Each structure stands twice: as structure tokens, then as C-alpha cells.
Amino acid sequence: MSVPLLEFHQVGFRYPNTPEPVLRDCSFTLEAGRKVALLGLNGSGKSTLFYLAAALYRRDRGEIYCQGQRLVHQPQRLRQWRQRIGLAFQDPEQQLVAATVAEDISYGLCNLGLSPPEVAARLHQTLQEFDLVALADRPLHHLSLGQKRRVALAGVMALAPTLLLLDEPTTYLDYQQRQQLRELLEKIHQQGTTIVIATHDLDFAYGWADWIMILVNGQVSVSDRASHVFGQWPTFAPELGTPTLLGLWQQLPPAWRQHRPFPRTVTEFSRELGERFRHLGDEC
């Protein structure tokens, strides 16, 4: 049996000067290879969970493991931990630290202690993979929000983490930028990286994730296959609303939907409707 990639065991955390903990006895297991959407209402603790997983915050109680290794807040152990878990913040300004795109991506590589030739090689590869070659010498303050997010993500992925955590990656992105993000995440996932996004964007989660986790009152109340969760969505999280495509699918006659998987993309939905209308035409 394989060792889980990430484990939380009864983890608790409370911010200073606040009466109630954000996370309380929070437990879950994450297997490698997943595309996970972490869902929850505002203030449910999604970002806090990420900061704890990335060892930016120290838990008050409980244990956290990555690939079977316990999180210990000692300099050398933290260095190794943070090489395995990469975190991209909701606001890219929080992690862009250099003047230009190339310098920012190189910053983390230099901190790893790589030699100049190794840094140059990894930088060149990352610029190509993230379509940033033309922007390599561009000052960061000249970039759009979408470009800054791409640079921040490139800086994280240049370090080759095993697990990638993305905090609200679709915020303020238009439809085209969201599609570009989806394609980029698919590419990263195909290279072997496990990805978890914390998001309020149900439509993005619905079309992208293969695993759903729902955070309620400081605990992971649901951790299951996306097909199962969305197939019985009102049972799990009615307070979060309903993904648009799922809502449209549920409005169709039950006979249309019987024994058919619900569509996860607009293309799949259109194909299902087209096929059904063709059958109706044949019957007429």
C-alpha cells in the first residue's frame, strides 16, 4: 500500500487574540496524483490549511505528514519540507520579490543552492514551459494580473515540488484566462505533480477536479471522488450553491439523464443535448 502524499491528523490552529480556532481536529488523507478542489465558505479555513501544509504556520496541535515524514519545525527539516510542497498565494504580489520575470524565477533556485549553470538551465526550461520567454526581462510591475500569477506559479514549479497548492487561482480572471489556467494545470498534472486548489469557483472546480474536499467548521467534512460528490451535490454542500452546468443538467427530464454521467464541460453538455435532440428527431 502506497504512503499518502499528505496527511493531517487532528490538526488544530487558532490565530492569536481570536476566541475560536480556525481548524479543530482537522483530519484527512491525500493520495498522490489527484486534482483536488478544496471548497468551503469564506472564513472556513482553506487558506489557513494551506499555510499549515506549506509549513508557513505552526500548528497548535495534531500532526502533519508528507510522504510519511512528520512535519518538524527545524531549519533543515523545513527546507526539505518546502521543497516538496509549493504554494502559490491568491495575491501574486505576496511572493514576487525581484525586479524582472527571470530574476524572480531565479531567486528560489539560487536559494536552493544550485550552481549558476544549474540555475540557468532550470530557468530556461521554466520560461519555456510557462510561455514566459518573451517576458523574461520584463519588469514585474509592467505585467497584468494574469501574467503575474503565471510568473508566481512558474517560480514555484521551478523548484519541482511534489505537491502544488493554489489559493483562489481564478480570482479576477476572465473566461479566456481561466481556460489558459486550466490548460496549464493539466500540463503540470500530466508531469506528475499533485495539485490542490482552494476555491470559491464552483464552475472551475466542477470541470477540473477529480477529487473534492469540503471544509466546514474547521474540519474536512467531505473527501471523495468528484463524480460521487457532484452526483449527490445537494446532500453534501447546498450552502455553497450549485455549479452552473450541473444545475442545467438537473433541470432536464429525468429520462434524459438516466444512466448517463453528468457533463463536466460545456462541450460535453452540448454533445449530450445534441445527441438527445437527434434521437427525438428520429422518433418523430
From Swiss-Prot:
Its EC number is 7.-.-.-. GO terms for cellular component: ATP-binding cassette (ABC) transporter complex. CDD domains: ABC_cobalt_CbiO_domain1. It holds the Pfam family ABC_tran. Its main location: membrane. Gene3D superfamilies: P-loop containing nucleotide triphosphate hydrolases. GO terms for molecular function: ATP binding; ATP hydrolysis activity; ATPase-coupled transmembrane transporter activity. ATP binds at residues 40-47. It is a peripheral membrane protein. Keywords: ATP-binding, Cell inner membrane, Cell membrane, Membrane, Nucleotide-binding, Translocase, Transport. InterPro entries: AAA+_ATPase, ABC_transporter-like_ATP-bd, ABC_transporter-like_CS, ABC_transpr_CbiO/EcfA_su, ECF_ABC_transporter_ATP-bd, P-loop_NTPase. Residues 6-242 form the ABC transporter domain. It is found in: Cell inner membrane. It comes from the Bacteria. Probably part of an ABC transporter complex. Responsible for energy coupling to the transport system. Belongs to the ABC transporter superfamily. This is Putative ABC transporter ATP-binding protein tll2439. It comes from Thermosynechococcus vestitus (strain NIES-2133 / IAM M-273 / BP-1).
